[in-house]
From Swiss-Prot:
Belongs to the universal ribosomal protein uS3 family. Residues 47-118 form the KH type-2 domain. GO terms for molecular function: rRNA binding; structural constituent of ribosome. One of its GO terms (cellular component) is chloroplast. It comes from the Eukaryota. Keywords: Chloroplast, Plastid, Ribonucleoprotein, Ribosomal protein, RNA-binding, rRNA-binding. Coiled coil: none annotated. The gene is rps3. GO terms for biological process: translation. Part of the 30S ribosomal subunit. HAMAP family: Ribosomal_uS3_B. This is Small ribosomal subunit protein uS3c. Its main location: plastid.
Amino acid sequence: MGQKINPLGFRLGVTQNHHSYWFAQPKNYSKLLQEDQKMRNCIENYVYKNIRNSSNYGGIARIEIKRKTDLIQVEIHTGFPALLVENRKRGIEQLKTDVQSILTSGDRKLRMTLTEVTKPYGEPNILAEYIALQLESRVAFRRTMKKAIELAKKTNIKGIKIQIAGRLNGAEIARVEWAREGRVPLQTLRAKIDYCYYPAQTIYGVLGIKIWIFQDEK
């Protein structure tokens, strides 16, 4: 069977950009890299606990981190920024406090901004969250995939592939099912392909969701 390389790492520097923008001395590099991951985990956990429920989800497309001499700038790209701002009394301020507590260098200021994604269902992370929410609510997987493809097509993408693996609909034996619409040229480097893996926790076990979205060709 053919093994698939991660499409994001494969195209890094060609059509994909880094999500962390900073330079560091070799002795500090690993510490700052771990700090970046802790900040991302903190933001995702906050959204999962305080915002995500059966009727809506956080909708975070990506988190970009930029470091300067005395400033750390965290930019959250989300399809639904109103959820972060309005859902709780303090909202973004509470999230900023939680992230600040993780930082090891207390002398650096933290600036957090929200950027709205104009076409949220064209982002694989947001689409995967939607699918996971449906599967956790016991909606049939074929119906969920069909609806997700319809939502994605409205954003004028050129192609999409969705794959779900696990005990589908509670079956005894795990299997893999997939659906594709349009072109998804994984071997073409100039093709801008976004990719996401997302686990869904169902009563029958974990389902693995993979989404490839072909945005455009450079």
